[in-house]
Amino acid sequence: MHIDRIELYLVENRFHKPWRTAYGSDPGNCAVFARMISGDKEGWSEASPLPGPNYSCEYGAGAFDVAKRFLAPSVIGRDFSSAKELNAAMSHVKGNPFAKSAIEMAWWCLDAYVKGKSLGALLGREKDEVDVGDGWGVYDSYDELIENIGKSLDMGYKRVKLKTMHGWDVEMLEAVRSVFPNETIHIDCNSSYTIDEIDIFKKMDKFHLAMIEQPFQNLDIYYHSKLQKQIETPLCLDETITEVWQAEQAAELGACGFINIKPARMYKE
């Protein structure tokens, strides 16, 4: 498939309320949209890093710049028969998975249009429907959080993810479980704790959470494995896993029971 043209757009989206997590407070997010054109067909994609480099080293304006200056020129005017070939053409750029995903996912969308298939069919879809969860950040009061959780459940969401941080963890979960004792709840720590705070997570076993996501720093596998051996609640790795080999190491070390897979975070050098 010949790539005739790529158009890139950087869009800033404002939230109704700032999104508060262990990383801080974000007033909105950034989206890098890519439009890839081949003949009379086109494919669109979206990669959404945060406005600043706090979740990862990438951020909105930076990902847009890398995609525009280094990645798009590497593929425009060339023919690719697979995503593997496309990624090989971008391999001179190290890392930057969000920027690369904007280009690659546009290619997948375009390839689906050209072949007349759904994207799900191309990716080997096994289900037509999946359960959707909702998520809430840090608030000024437990009552406000509990009210929002109730709204999510009333709307039919099957699970709810809660952001946590120092001062908004065990007591917060006590308050939530006093109102929602049996609902599927899990938490996301956004790398805000250390191995010296294992006792905090031992206290969380009584809440029967579905999982605890990314308690330790984003490059760590070893300390997550030590924590997992001392608690009953499954861990989930997010920022730590960017490539397949890291997932393999995490599995071998018993570092987690789940992996949060964000397509824009994953890449292969």
Language model features: what each stretch is:
Residues 162, 167-269:
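Catalytic core of soluble alpha/beta enzymes
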